[in-house]
């Protein structure tokens, strides 16, 4: 099958043998596509190598043969954002999450849009945490895993003053009592859930609980295997960077 003049974001690229790259691309029309880019080394291939870097938006032509498509041509459409520090790790995170969750050869246009919006947010220099929570919400919605952010699992309106535990299947379950500090760490305020549903920035003190709760839901859909980017972000936090 010929994939011609397709747009896609490069999620990951790694060396294969001496002169080639294995590249994962998130496309509009074909979902996540694995590309084999042969002969990318040498001075004449510098532009091609630059185009096949994570976060880069490219247009490419490839021939699908089995699991991998043979890359025939690729060029950068724009300039990928130059990210540093935590923003760079956040870029690694959004790419890794879709590398794990986006289905192969199954178009989910919403995921392409999610990635484009998150990439633009990182490039803008805006606050990272809120942009990442929006990204996670939209990815879950795009994959059909989203949940009601206005009502709890019993169908009752979410109370901004209450606390909830996010269940990957049932959504927000109201917590009636918190006996231990750990119980509180594993819950999120109703106010934060309502804000997420209404696309409003939650209160600063509610953001850590929202992050932990969303991570728990994502971990379920990742079959219990965490992300390397999570480990890197946690190590950065421990070092006080």
Curated annotation (Swiss-Prot):
**Segments crossing the lipid bilayer:** none
Entry keywords, A to Z: DNA damage, DNA recombination, DNA repair
Q: Which GO terms describe its biological process?
A: DNA recombination; double-strand break repair
Check the record and name the InterPro entries matching this protein. Answer: ARFGAP/RecO, DNA_rep/recomb_RecO_N, NA-bd_OB-fold, RecO, RecO_C
What's an example GO cellular component term for this entry? bacterial nucleoid
Q: Does the keyword DNA damage apply?
A: yes
UniProt superkingdom: Bacteria
UniProt cross-references to HAMAP family, sorted A to Z: RecO (MF_00201)
The family this protein is said to belong to: Belongs to the RecO family.
Please identify the protein, giving its name as recorded.
DNA repair protein RecO
| Protein source organism | Xanthomonas campestris pv. campestris (strain ATCC 33913 / DSM 3586 / NCPPB 528 / LMG 568 / P 25)
